[in-house]
């Protein structure tokens, strides 16, 4: 995008965005034609909602539900969309790419939809939780 001027579409989950999200400052500072699509299911792999410690804390695989990642663009003068339907996604993606402005599309998806691609919760077996 920097040298070619071509639009870029980055597709990631809400967990991945947690690691790289502040790159939006650079994207906005250079006014790059980057559209970031965040599939937001409220968790790592989808979150399991199980608190193994018994302390009432959120599960380590749960993220803040209903997070509005699109609102981050207000701070950096980019464009943000929050979408919940395929029609809204189609519109936001088309508009974001065509505008050539830094854009985040927060795509709220059902946490139970699809299949888990990994088993991070297996890293914390129940027999050692809370020890």
Regions found by a protein language model. Give the residues of each.
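Thiamine diphosphate
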Residues: 1-131
């Amino acid at each position: 995008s920097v040298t070619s001027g071509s639009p870029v579409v980055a597709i990631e989950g809400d967990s991945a965005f947690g690691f790289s999200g502040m790159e939006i400052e650079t994207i906005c500072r250079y006014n790059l034609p980057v559209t970031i699509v965040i599939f937001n299911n409220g968790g790592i792999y989808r979150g399991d909602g199980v608190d193994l410690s018994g302390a009432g804390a959120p599960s380590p695989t749960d993220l803040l539900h209903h997070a509005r990642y699109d609102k981050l663009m207000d701070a950096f003068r980019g464009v943000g969309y929050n979408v919940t339907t395929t029609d809204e996604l189609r519109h936001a993606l088309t508009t974001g790419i065509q505008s050539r402005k830094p854009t985040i599309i927060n795509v709220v998806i059902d946490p139970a939809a699809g299949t888990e691609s990994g088993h991070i919760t297996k890293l914390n077996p129940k027999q050692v939780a809370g020890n």
